[in-house]
Amino acid sequence: VATDHSNRLTGIPAAPFLAADIGGTHGRVALMRASHDGAGAVQTLAYRVFVCAEFPMLSELLQAFIDADVKIPVKHCVLACAGQIMGNEVVNDNLPWPIHLPQLRHALGLDEIAVLNDFEALAYALDDASADGGRHLCGPATPTGGPTLLIGPGTGLGAAVHIPAAGGGFVLGTEAGQMDFAPNSLRERQILAHLAPDGGYVPFEHVVSGPGLLAVYVALCAIHGDAPKLAAPEAVTKAAMKGDDAQAVEAVEIFCASLGSFAGNLAMTFMATGGVFLAGGFLSSIFELLERSAFEERFLHGRSARALLSQIPVRVTEHGLRGVHGAARWYLRHGMPGVGAPMPIAAGGAGA
C-alpha cells in the first residue's frame, strides 16, 4: 500500500514529471505538473493511451510517449501499476511483461521512479470522480459521507478504499479480487464446478473481469452442450447487447450479478457510506445491461446490513485520466522514494 515518506524531494512541484497508469490492456501516460490552484492539484500537459501488447517492454511504451509529446528533460516518474512488487520487479500475470524498476529507470534516463497500485491511484482521484458524479446505477443520488469504495473489473479485478481525513485522507489498497468466488445460484455452482472440476480455489477475479466474462461464457456453452462461437470478452458483450447469443446474454447477467455480490460484500466490510464507484470503460459499455441486471438485488440481497447498503449510492465512472491524475496527486502529496526502495503495491488491479 502507499505510505507516507519524509524524504520528499525539494523542487518536485515545479518540475513536470511523467505519470503512467499501466494495466493489463492499456497504458495511460501523461506529462504532469503541479498547478497553482492548491495543494495536490495537477495540470495535464500531454496525455496518450497505448495498447500494452504492442510494446515488447514498458520502457519502449514510455519512450514512445516521450518521443511524441515531451519537449523538455523529465527526470521523475510515478507509476501506477497493476501488480505485486517483488524486490525491484513488478509482477502480475495480467501484464504483458515483467517490470524491472532499475532497468526502466536506466533505459529512460530517469533519476527516480515511484510506484503505487493502479487502484490506489484511482482512489486518490476520487475527489474528481465525485465532482462529475459518473452515471448513477442504484441507491440514493448523494452519499452521506464516509469511506468511498472503488471497484474495477478489467483485465483483472481491482479494489481500493478512500478514507476521508484531514489533509485529503488516505487510501487502502486491497487484494479483494483474489477472494474466493461464492456462488449464489445453481447456475453459478455449475459454473464454479466447470472452472474448478476437482474443487479448489477460484477467485472472484476469474468471474468478475474481462477474461472472467469469457470464461463464464465458455462454461455456459459447455453446460448447454454448445461449441463457443465467441473468443473475446468484447465479442461476448457485443452479442449480449444485441441479444442474439443466449449464452452471451446469460454470461453478462451472471457477471453483473456476481459484481453486485462482490461490491456489496466490500461495501459492508469497509462501511462505504461515501459511495461505491465502479470504474472502467468496460462497465460503461454495458451500462444498460448492468442497469437491468440483478446487480442491485445482489448488492443488497439477504444481508443483515441491507438498511445500510440501501443508503449507499453506486455509480459507474470512466477510467480515463483518473489513474494518472490520482498517481500525480499521490506523488505531489508524498514525494518520491528512490528506486532502490520501491513502494510496495497490492496484487491485482483492474488492468484496464
PLM-predicted stretches and their roles:
Residues 1-73, 190-352:
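ATP-binding/phosphotransfer module of carbohydrate and carboxylate kinases, centering on a glycine-rich
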Residues 133-204, 287-290, 295-300, 304-309:
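Glycine-rich phosphate-binding loop of actin/hexokinase-like ATP-binding domains
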Residues 21, 78-82, 116, 148-156, ...:
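Short beta-strand segments
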Residues 49-52, 94-95, 114-121, 140-143, ...:
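Active-site nucleophile and cofactor-binding loops and adjacent substrate-binding regions
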Residues 27, 84-86, 156-160, 215, ...:
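Short, acidic Gly/Pro/Ser/Thr-rich loop/turn segments
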Residues 31-32, 90-92, 127-128, 162-164, ...:
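Short amphipathic alpha-helical segments
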Residues 69-115, 123-133, 150, 284-288:
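Short beta-strand-loop/turn "lid" adjacent to the catalytic site in phosphate-handling enzymes
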Residues 2-12, 112-148:
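Conserved phosphate-binding catalytic cores of ATP/NTP-utilizing and phosphoryl-transfer enzymes
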